[in-house]
């Protein structure tokens, strides 16, 4: 009885999420409408993105934002009472559906004009509230860079110069991306129960939007296979750290592996909620954070092993200066701290504590954006929906959770695979109490 009731709630959650995309077009990150799908025509573009990877058509019409708000509120009230009747083995699913209905409701209210503080928003969308970062770390990392980075001029100029020196030349980009993709695919195959049929085709091209990183085309899927093409932008500045991020976390063992495991879970269980991943949800916060930790696991959570990989797979084939390899560990540390700098800028602008000009000055002071770009980037944070909370803070929250579970790398891989198919809870991951049911019984 409980499964039928929860299936009914989940079906309505999916329908409302699909309908909301009419008003919130970038929300739906992944959708599998059936156990299998094949693209039946060639009406797609390699010039602009479609989110999700194919047109939803009429299924995104039928409900207004007010309809979604009222219906989600009614389902939230119902689930809060109904939870008292479910069995222990259905509690995680009930909690998951309740969380995601609350995410949907808050995002809908925001689209209708309701105002929230930054922390209220990230709590409502991702079940995460990031504490204020230690601002002393911004000054500390700059001092480390001053001592280590080569070159002359201001530290901001030396940061820009270093980025340029670790940028993969466009003539070498396809080979570097292809071989890096193959490596991460092989590790994923070794560590997880995946079929091995889902490694994307890698292509490079100049995209219309020079700031766009890549463009994906989904040609089909079934239980054992995602048929994907990923076009990487030749106009994007492909530094070594960006190659690592956009291969390891965006593809395998990151997002694409997560999508594959959710698809398999949907087919195995017929749970409607496993067919979607909404950008504004704790599912996406888990995916963003865990995918970053998962690509670290490919190197046994060892930065020295990761840097050795970068030397062999990126520096050498790209013809980069090998003397710079020894600086990569410090550079990765800086990149992580930069994410928190952007998070704090976003929070302070959102909450009205900083002006755009103050945010711009902060970003440029620490080299978190190029000189002259601060105002444009800071202005974009007026409408930021907690991106860096769902990405950077989520990564560190999940990293701590995995390490609290076990430092054994094989056990962490086992945990990751289970979580990809589970009704995860970011709140319980935050307090380190969550265990997928398959690992409890």
Where in the sequence are the language-model features?
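N-terminal maturation segment of proteins
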Residues: 1-441
């Amino acid at each position: 009885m409980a499964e039928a009731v929860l299936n009914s709630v989940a079906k309505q959650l999916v329908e409302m999420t699909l309908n909301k995309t009419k008003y919130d077009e970038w929300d739906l990150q992944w959708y599998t409408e059936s156990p299998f799908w094949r693209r039946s025509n060639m009406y797609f573009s390699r010039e602009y993105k479609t989110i999700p990877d194919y047109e939803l058509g009429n299924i995104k019409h039928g409900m207004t934002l007010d309809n979604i708000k009222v219906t989600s509120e009614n389902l939230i009230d119902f689930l809060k009472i109904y939870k008292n009747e479910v069995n222990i083995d259905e509690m995680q699913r009930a909690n998951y559906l309740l969380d995601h209905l609350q995410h949907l409701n808050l995002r809908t209210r925001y689209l209708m004009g309701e105002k929230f503080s930054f922390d209220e928003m990230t709590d409502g969308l991702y079940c995460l509230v990031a504490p204020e970062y230690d601002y002393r770390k911004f000054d500390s990392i700059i001092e480390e860079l001053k001592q280590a980075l080569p070159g002359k001029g201001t530290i901001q100029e030396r940061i820009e110069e270093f980025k340029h020196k670790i940028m993969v030349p466009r003539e070498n980009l396809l080979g570097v991306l292809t071989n890096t993709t193959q490596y991460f695919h092989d590790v994923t195959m070794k560590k997880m129960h995946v079929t091995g049929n889902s490694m994307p085709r890698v292509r490079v091209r100049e995209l219309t939007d020079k700031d766009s990183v890549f463009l994906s085309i989904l040609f089909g899927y079934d239980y054992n296979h995602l048929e994907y093409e990923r076009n990487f932008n030749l106009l994007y500045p492909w530094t070594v750290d960006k190659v690592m991020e956009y291969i390891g976390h965006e593809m395998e063992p990151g997002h694409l592996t997560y999508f594959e495991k959710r698809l398999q879970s949907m087919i195995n269980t017929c749970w409607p909620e496993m067919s979607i991943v909404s950008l504004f949800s704790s599912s996406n916060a888990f995916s963003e954070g865990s995918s970053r930790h998962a690509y670290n696991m490919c190197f046994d959570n060892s930065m020295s092993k990761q840097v050795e990989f970068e030397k062999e797979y990126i520096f050498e084939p790209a013809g980069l200066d090998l003397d710079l390899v020894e600086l990569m560990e410090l550079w990765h540390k800086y990149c992580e701290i930069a994410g928190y700098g952007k998070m704090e800028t976003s929070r302070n602008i959102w909450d009205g504590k900083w002006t755009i000009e103050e945010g711009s000055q902060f970003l440029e002071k620490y080299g978190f954006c190029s000189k002259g770009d601060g105002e444009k980037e800071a202005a974009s944070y007026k409408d930021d929906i907690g991106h860096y909370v769902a990405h950077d803070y989520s990564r560190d929250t999940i990293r701590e959770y995995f390490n609290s579970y076990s430092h054994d790398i094989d056990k962490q891989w086992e945990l990751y695979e289970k979580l990809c198919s589970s009704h995860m809870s970011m709140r319980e991951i935050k307090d380190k109490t969550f265990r997928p049911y398959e690992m409890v019984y």
